Amino acid sequence: MNTATGFIVLLVLATVIGCISADFQGGFEPYEEEDAERIFRRSTCTPTDQPCPYHESCCSGSCTYKANENGNQVKRCD
């Protein structure tokens, strides 16, 4: 077994052991429904003060023109 193969085997072994240990500590407990909805919404909407191409993509549901660091007016989520 050469060095690269040995390194890959150790990496896979460490990953498997880490996953098993996380499961014993409750790392893979199922999410509550509210948590899952919050995580999904956060991953699909644009957070506050980020550029917004459309109103419906903002987490707050609205965006307004605000001055950026160059003084230009850009649409950002509220």
Curated annotation (Swiss-Prot):
Q: Which organism is it from?
A: Hadronyche infensa (Fraser island funnel-web spider)
Primary location group:
secreted
Annotated keywords: Calcium channel impairing toxin, Cleavage on pair of basic residues, Disulfide bond, Ion channel impairing toxin, Knottin, Neurotoxin, Secreted, Signal, Toxin, Voltage-gated calcium channel impairing toxin
Q: Where is this protein localized, as stated in its record?
A: Secreted
In terms of domain of life, where is this protein from?
Eukaryota
Similarity-based family: Belongs to the neurotoxin 08 (Shiva) family. 01 (omega toxin) subfamily.
Q: Where is this site: Critical for insecticidal activity?
A: 51, 68, 76
Q: Name one GO cellular component term.
A: extracellular region
**Cited InterPro entries:** Omega-atracotox
Q: Which residues form the propeptide?
A: 23-42
- Free-text note regarding domains: The presence of a 'disulfide through disulfide knot' structurally defines this protein as a knottin.
**What is the protein name stated in its UniProt record?**
Omega-hexatoxin-Hi1a
